[in-house]
Curated annotation (Swiss-Prot):
Pathway: Cofactor biosynthesis; 7,8-dihydroneopterin triphosphate biosynthesis; 7,8-dihydroneopterin triphosphate from GTP: step 1/1. It comes from Burkholderia orbicola (strain MC0-3). It is an enzyme of class 3 (hydrolase). NCBIfam families: PRK13674.1-1. One of its GO terms (biological process) is tetrahydrofolate biosynthetic process. This is GTP cyclohydrolase FolE2 2. The gene is folE2-2.
Amino acid sequence: MEKALHRISSMNAALPDISLTDAAPGRRPLEWVGMQGIDLPVVVAEPGCRRDVHARADVQVDLPAPQVKGIHMSRLYGLLDGLADGEALSPAGLQRMLRAMVDSHRDCATRSARVRLRFDLLARRTALVTEGLAGWKAYPVRLDATLSGDAFALRAQVTVVYSSTCPCSAALSRHWIEQAFLTAFGHEARVEPTAVAAWLKRHATAATPHSQRSEAVVSVALPADGTTLGLLDLIDRVEQALGTPVQTAVKRADEQAFAVLNGGNLMFVEDAARRVQAALEDRHASPRVRVRHLESLHPHDAVAWAAPLREGADAC
């Protein structure tokens, strides 16, 4: 094997490389050049989550030298492949990799590098009520790391799926049931509790509010000197703010508890965005929120964005 690799290395040394020998015909600098959609196994250290995940990576460097025909993509690929060596992803590790990418392209006058990683964080989630019952839930994650000169920036984006019940629809449903109750019992001076209970058992769902699966996409800046990514903590904060995250394994008691949570957390899309933003702004830097309710009443979605006031709402 070593002899074969040596022969290949010797052949590469003798093979032409037009990215070095040929001049760029247009002679223009390029903002970013690189690759997208590289498959990569990475390790993510989050409590209660699977460590080994399949990621898709995008990686680029800038090409400010107008005379250089092309960058060295194999160098970027090799450095990116180092993320698969078993060390857990961290801000420091991503910064080291980007610095190495810039250093590997000094002959291109490169000053900046960036990487985007997409993967699903698989977390174990327990049932709401039933002891010993649990299941796995996947949370889409995106990491964006950029090094420009000496400035390193890292953002994490997570997607949380939850249930939303429309407050307006709930009010209309309650009104319908109220009127139906008055029609049934309004003429009576006294109503026995058992009769009320029997009526409710039969008619309490004569009108039901519409609810739907919804999603919150949250992006926050991570500290450059952080030792971990803190993804599960971010996800937990979003789910706690919303109050109705979708469940994995359930039995009837858990489904009932979920119905109670929905009834206690009626929300418009505006309510959801404000809840999440308020839960994050004291803990995370530059939180940005986008929520989407996949309306069951309409064929279109309801959406809202939130961002720090000084940044505007150009979120996620």
